[in-house]
Amino acid sequence: MMSTPTIKLAPVQKTLVVKSDVERAFTVFTSRMGSWWPRSHSTASSPLVDVIVEPRAGGRWYERGEDGSETEWGKVLRWEPPAKVVLAWQLDGRWKYNPACVTEVEINFTALGAQQTRVDLEHRHLERLGDNASAVRELLNSGWGGILDLYAKQLA
């Protein structure tokens, strides 16, 4: 029996320059994600009040709802402040937490000056999202653009 080969999808890649030193850019992205993450981008039944990235490799990445509930999004794969964080995105192609479905979001922070930092985001292994991976990739491509705009405004 022949297996169907998996078609590799191009990663979503975004780059922006923010008005911040590299340490603050990293901290606001990781430790204050809930302050800029759009409230509409939630997977829980209760309205989103915070997004938490536990500051260590192996830490959790999750949202907290108004009712105190926690909904998993993934895990921290690499924690290298203030230069890099790699997150395991464990939301499947239907935006539900699935520990068996792992795509990766890598964010690199590069100081360009005292108050300027380049932020490079790559969301890869999108073919792992299943049958509707191509459609989800397009949603992520536009979604990450808007999300990073909100992040940049938080730093301005």
PLM features: residue spans?
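A conserved amphipathic terminal alpha-helix motif
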Residues: 125-156
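Hydrophobic pocket/interface hotspot
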Residues: 25-29, 61, 76, 87, ...
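Short, highly charged C-terminal tails/helix-capping segments
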Residues: 45, 50, 153-156
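Hydrophobic ligand-binding cavity/cleft-lining segments
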Residues: 1-48
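Short, compositionally biased strand/turn segments
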Residues: 1, 50-60
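Hydrophobic-ligand binding "helix-grip"
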Residues: 37, 43, 51-52, 66-116, ...
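Generic structural detector for well-ordered beta-strands
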Residues: 15-19, 54, 62, 75, ...
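Solvent-exposed alpha-helix faces
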Residues: 30-34, 81, 149
